[in-house]
Amino acid sequence: MRPRWTGSGSPVRVAQLADAAVLSGQRPLRPPRSPRTTSPYPFVPMSRPLRILLACSCFAASAALAQPPTTPVPTAPAATAALPSIATRTAGMVRRDGLFPLYWDERTGKIYLEIPAMDQEFIYFTSLPWGVGSNDIGLDRNQLGAERLVAFSRSGPRVLLIEKNTRFRGVSADANEARGVEESFARSAIFGFTVEAQDGLRVLVDATEFVVRDAHDAIGALRRTQQGTFTLDRTRSAVYMPHTKAFPRNTEIEVTLTLAGTNPGRYVRDVTPNPEAITIRERHSLVALPEPGFHMREADPRSAFFGISYQDYAQPLNGQFVQRFASRHRLEKKNLGAARSEPVKPIIYYVDNTAPEPIRSALVEGTRWWNQAFEAAGYINAFRVEVLPDSIDPLDVRYNVIEYAHRATRGWSYGGAVTDPRTGEMMKGHVILGSLRARQDFLIGEGLDQPYATGTEKAERVQAMVLARIRQLAAHEVGHTLGMAHNYISSAQGRTSVMDYPHPMISLKTNGDVDITNAYETGIGEWDKVAVTWGYGEFPGDEKKQLDSVLVAARAKGLTFLTDQDARPVSSASPNTHLWDNGVDAVTELKRMMTVRERALTKFGETAIKRGAPMATLEDVLVPVYLHHRYQIEAAIKVVGGVTYAYTMRGDGVAGPVSVPAARQNTAIDAIADVLSPANLALPRSLIAQLPPRPFLFEPTRELFDRWTGITFDPLAPGATIAAVTFDLLLNEERAARMVSQHAMDPALPGFSDLLKRMELHIFASAPLSAYDFTLAALVQRSYVDHVLTLAESAEMPLVRAEARAALVNMLGTTLRPGVTGRGSAYTGQLAADIRAWMAGNYKPAEKKVKITVPPGSPIGEW
């Protein structure tokens, strides 16, 4: 039978704690005391009146315990006779009727909330209508907070707003069993109110202090990012009535808050007129629960759908204790059982009308791609996209919105949702797109396309590339708000999903020029159609079996899913699952990309900037071109010590994990070493000659290369940057440990010591080099030894430490042996001295490691 949420209250909860204790062999919490003739406690004589009082108390307690539990009858408390009526108390105030009626007292600046009934659950969340504007702090305009399942509860003159605990449940028809679970786990009282007036069961409370507070925890965000100590200044905070509204199914209260602080950090100083006073706006949303009837779909790790989970203590011992369900919007066919049907109610998304053209139109076009997936799932016009009209509040829970947010520096875009914690039903999708991503993409395009031959061109090819990226970005973030996680393996399967992180696919024309016209795919991907069919398709009959068949059929076509946990860690093992990569084979694509990069750098010059721009700003455009292969290096490195695997289920017949073959690993090692060759690190001398120091008014930013040379451009620092990025990934201690383990299981596979030997041969290869190339090679050697020393010092696996130490000892007798003279002897001599000092306990690699700051990489567009 399909699970369908039919109630309007919380799920029934249960826990058989006593039985669980017996079954687990644990001692009961309060074991019955065995009969005994003497008390373990000293006897204290009691007077006769005290004995009578105690006896009466015990009798009363016994009688109370003997009574069956009763359901309280809603009645108005007797003590409320002295309370005024709501009409009397709110006379002269502005009333806004809705789910929770509001009363605004203009004279005192207070706002009152009418509570129609106690113990009725609803959803409460906060948001940030007016943000801070710093990507690093993270307090973006219209950012959503976490949703909470709450209810008002009254005790005499006090009303508490209680957050329910939805992580522990007992889904059972036995009310006592359910109550046992509910009472076993703590709830959270969010706020306490005093009753001001009453009409029967309806009460009025002063909500001013509840709403005029930092409920979104902006102060915490400032503290966590080390931006100073801030507190709420109530004298500079107030209810913001223009955006305080009440509707039949939601009540919205907005407030202006001023956070006062001392010693504000750099990020705050960058974005506020007075960094000691940060004035923002926060909103409190009180939302009715969705109507009953939402169909809960059991989660499947192969499907890419996010979800909710909870422990169900009412499950039998052989049942599924942890329950998991997919998070989805409510979508139903008008004609159940029809192969294709219009929906009962379509899913509609609104694009922020503050986004400028042509970006706004690109956002609309890219978001509309999702209708292709819903059509493939059997729907007709089930997914629509419109521009947000002025009459719709973007934070109103009734509307799905794509927000265009501005920040001082570039940063992530992301998609979120307001979700019913009981069922996983998505009530509101909400996307926040960082506007500076488009400008960063434009910068990338300028560097690759070199569009300014005369210096006044409009760079139309670059703009077309950026708009293609914006379309894909909109589709990606909306995918999250439809319930789907990243699918980072799709690039290795032919760019089959918008839920991947796409690197621009740049190629060379037949004449050798760089071609940016096919940078991004158009339209929804084949995997996305599979995911939407699994998540939103109608499956009459045996749903579980039919859902499984969707994923089995997809696998047969080569369409699978791996996500963040498989791609984001620097030690991750999948050779096919990466961020910002391209190509079916990571190493082959790295070699192709190196050819494109070489051509782009050879061509690079003043045609990358407009006429009249300071020549020093060439470096701004140079950085993404020089680091063009940055993420493909990471992808190729994951082949080393790599393991091919999938999310498998018992009985699906899918093979288990397999180590990447030795030949492919060794090819990857050689390709990575080639990246570090001086020829691939050096900049054209003609380009270096065009890069003056930064001029007046053009301060250096974190988007530029680090430098040891002060004000002048440092031609060595870019190469040192690539070396640092490469060795941080390649000589990761978990990757090293995996290579030790793989070699132990199969000696034909390269072990960690084999990796070190192979890299040493490449890095210390003797060849006639120019002074520039020789110095770059010395920096690579320094970085390599620093990383090996770090592993020898602090790797958690002892065998990794041992093999790293052995490699260092071997270097002292070969590459770094005494007596080496000539060019570079000072560099190699210092390396040898540092290794010997470490072996003597007089050198700490973590303290001595070459420090170089790498320019920010991610995002190239989304989260």
Model-predicted segments: where are they?
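Conserved catalytic/binding loops enriched for acidic/polar residues
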Residues: 493-863
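Bacterial N-terminal signal peptides that target proteins for export
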Residues: 41-53
